[in-house]
Amino acid sequence: MSAASPLRWQLTEHAPLRALNTFHVDATARWLLNIHAPEALPDALAAPQIAGQPLLVLGSGSNVLLAGDPPGCVLCFDNRDITIIAHHADHAIVRAGAGVNWHGLVMYSLQQGLSGLENLALIPGTVGACPIQNIGAYGAQVSDFIHVVEAYDRGSQQFVRMTPAECAFGYRDSVFKQQPDRYLIVAVEFNLPLLHELRLDYAGIRDELARMGAELAGAADVAQAVINIRQRKLPDPEVLGNAGSFFKNPLLPSEQIAALQASFADMPVFPGEQPGQGKLSAAWLIEQCGWKGKREGDAGISEAHALVLVNHGSASGAQLLAFARQVAESVRERYSVILEPEPRVIGAHW
């Protein structure tokens, strides 16, 4: 059964979600709300079938583990427009709808001669999801280039324009993650430079550029290098169900880092997000505990990258979650370091 306002929104009952999550686990939405025109949100949310119900927003389902059926209503944004709304001498403002494919936006910006997003190429997901996690990779994070986040505030029942400061961005964090039931992101405006200093901090990118023969690398070359690396390291979700990196790299006080290095001299440490803080490699910790390439039933860790939880076929969300908990517990027992998941876990507690 479905209800709709022509061309603006559609509501479907008992909708299967297997095709809407990259782990390819079975789950069912009591109601699935597709939003074609964001301005229709207030009317759609007032529909009697879903009014007052919990909402779960799914982009491409690439940052969620459905460990059970989500309560209430699942919402998908289908607005996929990209517009350059302002040109300046050294930068442009690009607006993208929440339903735009993230990698598609990265490639579009490069085709327009704009830079900034190249290190974030091939990250799965949609534009609407990118501010929630403050997605990042290879030394860059999306908050560095966000101009405004356009959202619907369910508290005030108003559309709002939020500056980066109001978004409270942190390492894989934001106000949208801290208050998941308040804001519905409908579009994002990006401030993208025509030229900027390339981020080549990671040796892997420099090595890949050398392999490509890109001696005077530009932003498009960096994007291609990132694509090459990610395709080698990360399994294609269409072939092997996964959500990319499943665990966050732990941020710890410098004193705890020093104590760990005293016991484990070969432990790699990276600069933290703040003074007095360091970052550990979750992949290294997991690999040292012997989990890389292991599996139980159809739940496992990728053979290529220890951060990637994979579904080899028919694992349920609950089975994947149980396996991930085993991995995290073994790291805690050996290193006294607590691993946290990057994806949002639905239907169970971490």
Swiss-Prot record:
NCBIfam families: murB (TIGR00179), PRK00046.1 (NF000755), PRK13903.1 (NF010478). PROSITE patterns: FAD_PCMH. Its cofactor is FAD. PANTHER family: UDP-N-ACETYLENOLPYRUVOYLGLUCOSAMINE REDUCTASE. The active site is at R172, S245 (proton donor), E342. Its EC number is 1.3.1.98. Keywords: Cell cycle, Cell division, Cell shape, Cell wall biogenesis/degradation, Cytoplasm, FAD, Flavoprotein, NADP, Oxidoreductase, Peptidoglycan synthesis. Belongs to the MurB family. GO terms for molecular function: FAD binding; UDP-N-acetylmuramate dehydrogenase activity. It comes from the Bacteria. Its main location: cytoplasm. Pathway: Cell wall biogenesis; peptidoglycan biosynthesis. It holds the Pfam family MurB_C. The gene is murB. Residues 24-195 form the FAD-binding PCMH-type domain. Cell wall formation. It catalyses: UDP-N-acetyl-alpha-D-muramate + NADP(+) = UDP-N-acetyl-3-O-(1-carboxyvinyl)-alpha-D-glucosamine + NADPH + H(+). GO terms for cellular component: cytosol. This is UDP-N-acetylenolpyruvoylglucosamine reductase. InterPro entries: FAD-bd_PCMH, FAD-bd_PCMH-like_sf, FAD-bd_PCMH_sub1, FAD-bd_PCMH_sub2, MurB, MurB_C, MurB_C_sf, Oxid_FAD_bind_N.
